[in-house]
Amino acid sequence: MVALAAMVVASAGFANAQTTRIRLMAANITSGNNQSYDPGHGTRIFQGLDPDIIMIQEFNYGSDSTTDIRNFVNLAFGSSFQYFREAGGGIPNGVISRYPILEAGEWEDTNVSDREFVWAKIDVPGDKNLWAISVHLLTSSSSNRNNQATLLKNFINAKPIPATDYLVIGGDFNTDNRTESCINTLSSLVVTSGPYPSDGTSNSSRFNTNAGRNKPYDWVLVNSTLSQYGTGVVIGSRTFTNGLVFDSRVYSPLSEVSPVLSGDSGATNMQHMAVV
């Protein structure tokens, strides 16, 4: 697996080739009692990590009106960012992007009633588009998650998304381990093997992303067309070669990710770490 917080995209020109670093992020980092970003812990993490393309879950804020969602995107990322959020659903998925969203939509996940798969075609620098897909798989069982992955794979193939374009599937997979059947199902579309993102410590939990830091719930998976451009995540003086599992309780120095507070990743009902 290549779980990129950053990729380098070559953009050909008449005289010189240019590169653009693009930071990708999967984030189900709501907190509080309403599965929303209202309390602010997740918002500070977004501000501190400064991602370019975000596959977000539980995309709730305020009254969930268009105005409130736009205000959240402005606050967490900036007024120039574009977004697509699925219509309806109690805990909707979405894609947020620094770069123009050319087309976006949702695919019905018949396994669950409160969210769908969300996709966006994004005009990143260079001659290829990037397709970002935001997913939130079930906690109920590995077999149910594999059913969802199979459905998603069929949607992607039917679209179709060109193999020559960039593809990233990111979000909350709720996987108990790195070898679940849903991961194998998606392996024909994206790179699923290690090395994996880490929180930068030597702790045995450093690769895990759930609140208890004992399971790899969250993923950023890219296709082989994109994985060749993978590059380390650079934040301040630190480089995370294989991507970052961000936990404010262990990250140091926090001054590099201001305005994040040390307790943000441990906030009440924050069940996941951000992955970049």
Give a label for each model feature:
Residues 18-22, 78-80, 102-103, 229-230:
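Beta-strand initiation motifs
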Residues 2-11:
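Bacterial N-terminal signal peptides
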Residues 22, 29, 36-54, 59, ...:
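Extracytoplasmic, non-cytosolic globular domains
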Residues 12-76, 88-92, 146-150, 244-274:
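N-terminal, active-site-proximal structural segment of metallo-dependent hydrolase catalytic domains
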Residues 112, 158-167, 175-276:
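Metal-dependent phosphoester-hydrolase catalytic domains
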Residues 59-137:
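Structured beta-strand-rich core segments of catalytic domains in phosphoester-bond hydrolases
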Residues 22, 94, 118, 130, ...:
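A broad, low-specificity signal marking well-ordered, structured residues that form hydrophobic/aromatic
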